[in-house]
Amino acid sequence: MSATGKLQRKRKFLLSSRHVECGGFTEYSPTPLIELTSLAQHLGIKNLFVKDESYRFGLNAFKVLGGSFAIGSYIANELGEDIDDLSYMRLVSDEVRSLLGSKTFITTTDGNHGRGVAWTANRLKQQAIVYMPQGSAAERLSNIRAEGAQAEITDMNYDDTGRYTSELAQKNGWIIVQDTAWDGYTRVPLWIMQGYMTMALEAYEQLPVKPTHIFLQAGVGSLAGSVQGFFADIYGRSCPLTFIVEPKG
């Protein structure tokens, strides 16, 4: 199956997943690719485009693409079905709940990933627990709780909070939805990366010309690896130059 064919699976899942916003139902739609004409002229380049993820499901971040596909894929796997064949209505049906019971998804986050997991669990009528490291913003905690999750800020750093989350999951039979992999834990992070590819597919279809350079944030590496993998599969040896960047400090 081609890269675009594989990625249509992720978009099919998103298209079938409607969510409540402002009292109505709004379906998935691609976020805009904005052309920054003036900045391109200032820099002396022909075109400059930026993917504006502030519109993504009203959550102001792309992270929900990964969490939603990972949780959907987990449920499909538990049912022994292909996610291609699972509509949103079936995912939230009484039949599925009777087969699987109520699942609890747990994660460590400093903000957007946890909010995406909480949002998805809420829409799929499941439970979410989110732990945030010491120093996390109170506003982000509030945003996660607003999505129906049990969430709190710990007195530990990120790595220790992650270990605490893992211990709780093992003790209680909860499902970890983390965007980083470690020995023995690779399937869910891979699903998350596959979900991120939705954004790459959108950009590929929106671009009027083949890009020459792509700039991506480093983060934990999931987005960078996902988008690079997508364009490498599309363009092969003529893949655009990719730069992985992070803000100073």
Q: What annotation goes with each model-predicted range?
A:
Residues 1-249:
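PLP-dependent amino-acid enzyme catalytic core
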